[in-house]
Amino acid sequence: MRHDHRPYWMHALWEQFENAWTRHFLEPHFESLGGHAKVVRPWNVEVFGPNVHAGQAIHIVSRKDQPVSFTVWSPSDAPGEIHIGDCCFFAGGIRILAAEKIVIGNAALLAKSVTITDSDWHGLYDRITARPPSAPVIIGDNVWIGAGAFVGKGVTIGDNAVIGARSIVTKDVPANTVVAGAPARPIRTLDPDGPFKTRLEMLGDAEGLDRFMKAAYRDQLKGNS
């Protein structure tokens, strides 16, 4: 689409429909979901398995050809879990797969087609055992993960880190570090006292995400009738 010709009132009605769908059909699949979630095309978001938790003001942008999925391996004796902080953003095509535990901190920014998994899902030799090797993945606050990146089992990523597009992350990333490549390697260190501006600051109050989205669409659709 080259230009969205809808008037703002038409977008507002569509947004109400998306919000209602989120509340009635998507939210019940979460173990817990904070208020003010904003999900674009929520029918393209899949939550499979128990123990998927998300904080306040989560923002998900999905498409038919780029669905977003949160998947938990759930054997009865030791189900996995996913914990997502406040004010996180998930673009289309993202896959989060937990056999044990994945934690994503506040204000995380995940670009399209990112994959995060805490398991290999099969052994190198034993490819049929139902208990795959796994290790928790911990992602800090204000982490930015570029498009198409892969984060594997046992990885810890520190606060404010940046993961370059299409990077393959198999080892820990220190806080305030930019990594890129396959495998990912440090290419820059950020000033921990630098002028960071985070989604948590912008959207931290209860109505922040609603105000941000309404302002953005009013500006985009102004003049349409």
Question: Where are each of the predicted segments found?
Answer:
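Domain-scale signature associated with acetyltransferase and cell-envelope carbohydrate enzymes
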Residues: 1-117, 140-141, 175, 184-225
